[in-house]
Amino acid sequence: MAKTSMKAREAKRAQLVAKFAEKRAALKVIIASPASSDEDRWDAVLKLQALPRDSSASRQRNRCNQTGRPHGFLRKFGLSRIKLREATMRGEVPGLRKASW
């Protein structure tokens, strides 16, 4: 089990990403645009740097919904490999079963 503080930190990051997504995207468009002047581009870079670090989507970490485990995470199910296996063995995941050949 992950610490409660780690789960809370990830929730806060998700909230910040959602809050600043539009602003961040608009600044990136200005930076990437060849039509924008050097001054506009530089201002956009400074504004982007002034945003909170945790508002960047790349700082988010996928975690298991049940345990908070960061490794072995399967996006399709939102669970770690361990919890997915347990749920599969109990028959809680429709259409999923242990491989046998």
From Swiss-Prot:
Q: What is this protein called?
A: Small ribosomal subunit protein uS14
Q: Which GO terms are recorded in the biological process aspect for this UniProt protein?
A: translation
**Cellular component annotations (GO), alphabetically ordered:** cytoplasm; small ribosomal subunit
Task: Please give the function described in this protein's UniProt entry.
Answer: Binds 16S rRNA, required for the assembly of 30S particles and may also be responsible for determining the conformation of the 16S rRNA at the A site.
Keyword annotations from UniProtKB, A to Z: Ribonucleoprotein, Ribosomal protein, RNA-binding, rRNA-binding
Spell out where the chain crosses the membrane.
none
Q: Which organism is it from?
A: Shewanella oneidensis (strain ATCC 700550 / JCM 31522 / CIP 106686 / LMG 19005 / NCIMB 14063 / MR-1)
Q: Which residues form a coiled coil?
A: none
Gene Ontology terms, MF aspect: rRNA binding; structural constituent of ribosome
Spell out the subunit comment: Part of the 30S ribosomal subunit. Contacts proteins S3 and S10.
Please state which protein family the record places this protein in.
Belongs to the universal ribosomal protein uS14 family.
Q: Which Pfam families match?
A: Ribosomal_S14
Q: Which InterPro entries match?
A: Ribosomal_uS14, Ribosomal_uS14_bac/plastid, Ribosomal_uS14_CS
Q: Does the keyword Nucleotide-binding apply?
A: no
